[in-house]
Design a protein with these regions (language model features):
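Non-ligating segments of multi-cofactor redox enzymes
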Residues: 1-225, 230-233, 237-265
């Protein structure tokens, strides 16, 4: 078994290892990409459209406090764009390690927040003027346009979810999640990828091959049979593509029950 897992891990280096598996689309996830285009393009003519992004930022921060990066895999407008529009034309390559590295993620987050805050402070001086809302909205519009262009190019030439590896909003969610976890809020509210029985796992690695973020669930299940990786966006793509049909999205309490049930059998 160890030998098989080592061989599979080495296969990650192959360019054709990753599969363009169909995503699981709810109505929101299926059409949320329209919001990105509306703000990024339409906002150039009507800057106030950018103010809607404030609601997005509030939503992802609050949901992350309870459920981790669930927003990324189920509600995110950019995620919808990458999965719905760019996936079919993506080269779907292995995401370079440096884009996933801590220095890159932390460094880009600091760089982004510094520039965003600097511009926000400058705009705040216009408070009370006629142009304040337009200038504030345009700040978010330009940000969305940047992600549309940069994230779109990375999606086409590397992998659909390349941007998500170092996305500042993803980092913000992880900070919110860590706070929620420290306060014990996530214990009952967070659902994680759960394997009903490790013994039934084929170790085929398909959960990794279809994972939008190229994570390796089959190698990282905890003692509670849950995938605890903070980067998991809980999109259920691996759940739908597991050949053994032993994966599901469960709370910790339900995961323990599933483990006990499998043990009895």
């Amino acid at each position: 078994m160890v030998y098989i897992r080592r061989i599979i891990k080495e296969d990650l280096l192959l360019s054709n290892y990753y599969i363009k598996a169909n995503r699981t689309f709810s109505t929101i996830r299926k059409y949320a990409w329209i919001f990105t285009v509306l703000v990024a393009i339409g906002g150039l003519w009507e800057p106030k459209l950018g103010l809607l992004v404030i609601l997005i930022m509030m939503g992802l921060t609050i949901t992350a406090f309870f459920t981790g990066r669930y927003w990324c895999g189920n509600f995110c407008p950019h995620g919808s764009l990458f999965d719905k529009v760019f996936l079919p034309i993506s080269q779907n390559k292995k995401i370079p390690k440096f884009l996933k590295s801590k220095p890159m993620v932390i460094g880009f987050f600091i760089f982004f927040m510094f520039n965003f805050s600097r511009k926000l402070i400058k705009i705040s001086k216009l408070w009370g003027t006629f142009s304040f809302l337009d200038k504030l909205g345009l700040l978010f519009v330009n940000t969305y346009l940047m992600v549309l262009i940069v994230g779109g190019l990375l999606a086409i030439f590397v992998n659909p979810r390349t941007w998500c590896q170092f996305c500042p909003m993803g980092s913000l969610q992880k900070l919110s999640y860590k706070l929620g976890k420290k306060l014990g809020v996530t214990k009952k509210s967070e659902k994680k990828i759960t394997i009903s029985s490790k013994d039934k796992c084929y170790a085929c690695g398909k959960c990794s091959r279809v994972c939008p973020l190229q994570l390796t669930p089959y190698l990282e299940f905890s003692d509670n049979n849950q995938f605890d990786n903070i980067n998991c966006i809980k999109c259920s793509t691996c759940v739908k593509n597991c050949p053994a049909n032993i994966l599901s999205l469960e709370t910790e309490e339900n995961a323990i029950k599933l483990k006990e049930k499998a043990f009895i059998k």
